[in-house]
UniProtKB/Swiss-Prot annotation:
Protein name per its UniProtKB record: CTP synthase
Enzyme nomenclature, EC number: 6.3.4.2
Species the sequence originates in: Wolinella succinogenes (strain ATCC 29543 / DSM 1740 / CCUG 13145 / JCM 31913 / LMG 7466 / NCTC 11488 / FDC 602W) (Vibrio succinogenes)
Gene: pyrG
Active site annotation, chain numbering: C386, H521, E523
Metabolic or biological pathway: Pyrimidine metabolism; CTP biosynthesis via de novo pathway; CTP from UDP: step 2/2
Gene Ontology BP, a term: pyrimidine nucleobase biosynthetic process
The protein's role, per its UniProt record: Catalyzes the ATP-dependent amination of UTP to CTP with either L-glutamine or ammonia as the source of nitrogen. Regulates intracellular CTP levels through interactions with the four ribonucleotide triphosphates.
CDD domains referenced in this protein's UniProt entry, alphabetically: CTPS_N, GATase1_CTP_Synthase
Length: 552
């Protein structure tokens, strides 16, 4: 390997958003990084969140969407999940930071006397900390794609934009490029696409000292050449640097669309590089199988955050990955667990599989257990994740073992039958002993990150993982299955098929076609080109049993 490959001069691609939020900056960043990776480059990616929370770990799913957990136990923005899924790479805590983390770090350093009595200010101290974290994420990479959350014009984002401006000044034009994602709204009454909001957004960026080199124009329909020329002139970018990003039927189509729009040409030109040519044949094959699959299955998704499906983003994508690799469309039938409580299990009839995901709190729990019982008694393939596994154990204890008061200490701290309990000490990711109680702070006190799990010989869980005896999966939970009840449930047919340092990690029914619960979150390690084995097998078994039922 050449010295330049070992210690490359990192090139920075900053991605900002204008007009409004939720335009797809995360997908844009992931897509650009994917094309560069498939061109043979060593690519890193970073998400900056301007909110003042230290991390999203204690934020409501309705407020923020899903919390994505990295292998090293960081609770991060859901865009980190997109990055991992697109790039088929594990990222760490250094690939996502917030305003809260930046200020906390600066204030703690000031308290230790690290600034030698100086007055601490946004410029230079906060901005310098931001630049330090950006450079840290880019170490050893040929490219670092940096996504700035929020919208240009938000007061919270100003220090980060100043850091971008300073890095361009310090590193030079051949190492920094600015990509601005913006909306071209369609006025349906007139049938017109409007460029004025984009022009105003770019003007706002310029006032801060940043001129974008590439405009990503989000639109419901194709942009006429006249509008591209208008954007090119009004925003002072080359014509071929106006990249049209039409709504796509799947997010995995976006890198292919960007490749057709030739987005890598203006990037190579800015960085004074030869033509960049990605190899996307395998990616293209999988996208075709998403768009035109041979088979289909219907999976009942029994949850309680259904009004904001972003809360289950990684799991939804994991089902897509499994379907793509099986050439099967996964139809998700959304089943509100509270409606099942009040109206019964009728929505679960005629589905091919039942999935109960993770969650927190007692609301909707009875409905989830009714769904689990329905899957168990009717031999429907079932996958329970985190809370879903815990509820499967409680349902089994109540309805098979006859332990009427079986419960979780999360719902009833005084329950006489704590099937699920709060484990008060455990070894964390770094090998340190952690102690937690009901009075511990909510933030950062869960069992987080990647842990090893040993799988039981001859189990369906081990078969799902292609016979692997030891796997690594990610966790995000406070409560554990109580080993005190292990012997009783195993004698009745619900066996422990996975464990880690004495903790129950996976359960399965021995007299059922496919009924598995896992304490970990398999969705966090699923990728389009490398689907998670237990989710892939769940869809595969649902499809196989559907075909058996259809043919019989």
């Amino acid at each position: 390997m050449s010295e330049s490959k070992k210690n490359p001069e990192t090139k920075y691609i900053f991605v900002t958003g204008g007009v409004l939020s939720s335009l797809g900056k995360g997908i844009t960043s992931s897509s650009v990084a994917t094309l560069l990776k498939h061109s043979g480059f060593n690519v890193g990616i970073l998400k900056i969140d301007p909110y003042i929370n230290v991390d999203p770990g204690t934020m409501s799913p309705f407020e923020h969407g899903e919390v994505f957990v990295t292998y090293d136990g960081a609770e991060t923005d859901l865009d980190i999940g997109h990055y991992e899924r697109f790039l088929n790479t594990n990222f760490s805590s250094k690939h996502n930071f917030t305003t809260g983390q930046v200020y906390l770090s600066v204030i703690e350093r000031e308290r230790r006397g690290g600034y030698l009595g100086k007055t601490i200010q946004v410029i230079p101290h906060i901005v310098d900390e931001i630049k330090h974290r950006v450079r840290l994420a880019g170490e050893g990479k040929e490219f670092l794609v940096v996504e700035l959350g929020g919208t240009v014009g938000d007061i919270e984002g100003l220090p980060f934009l100043e850091a971008m401006r300073e890095m361009k000044h310090e590193l030079g034009l051949e190492r920094v490029i600015s990509v601005h994602v913006t909306l071209i709204p369609l006025i349906k009454a007139a049938g017109e696409l409007k460029t004025k909001p984009t022009q105003h957004s770019v003007q706002e960026l310029r006032r801060i000292g940043i001129t974008p080199q590439i405009i990503i124009a989000r639109s419901e329909k194709p942009l006429p050449k006249e509008l591209k020329k208008k954007l090119s002139l009004g925003c002072d970018v080359d014509y071929d640097s106006v990249i049209v990003a039409e709504d796509a039927p799947t997010i995995y189509q976006v890198p292919l669309n960007f490749m057709k729009e030739d987005i890598l040409t203006p990037i190579a030109r800015r960085f004074n590089m030869p033509k960049i040519e990605p190899k996307m044949e395998e990616w293209n094959r999988l996208v075709k199988q998403i768009l035109a699959p041979k088979d289909e299955v219907t999976i009942a998704f029994v949850g309680k955050y259904l009004s904001l499906k972003e809360s289950y983003k990684s799991l939804i994508e994991a089902l897509t990955h499994a379907g793509a690799n099986l050439d099967t469309k996964v139809n998700i039938k959304w089943c509100d667990s509270e409606e099942i409580e009040s109206s019964g299990v009728e929505p679960l009839r005629y589905v091919d599989g039942i999935l109960v995901p993770g969650g927190f709190g007692e609301r909707g729990v009875k409905g989830k257990m009714e769904a689990i019982r329905f899957a168990r008694e009717n031999k429907i393939p079932f996958l329970g994740i985190c809370l879903g596994m815990q509820l499967a154990m409680i349902e089994f204890a109540r309805n098979v073992l006859g332990i009427a008061e079986a419960n979780s200490m999360e719902f009833d701290p005084q329950t006489p039958e704590p099937i699920i309990y709060l484990i008060e000490d455990f070894i964390d990711q770094q090998g340190n002993k952690q102690v937690r109680t009901h009075t511990s702070p909510m933030g950062g006190t869960m069992r987080l990150g990647e842990y090893e799990c040993g799988l039981k010989e001859g189990s369906q869980t081990k078969a799902a993982y292609q016979g692997e005896s030891l796997i690594k999966e990610r966790h995000r939970h406070r409560y554990e299955a109580n080993p005190k009840y292990r012997e009783r449930i195993e004698q009745a047919g619900l066996i422990v098929s996975g464990e880690s340092e004495g903790l129950i990690e996976a359960l399965e029914l021995v007299d059922h076609p496919w009924f598995i619960g896992v304490q970990f979150h398999p969705e966090f390690t699923s990728r389009l080109q490398n689907p998670n084995p237990v989710i892939l097998t769940f869809i595969q078994k649902s499809l196989e049993l559907k075909k058996v039922d259809r043919d019989s």
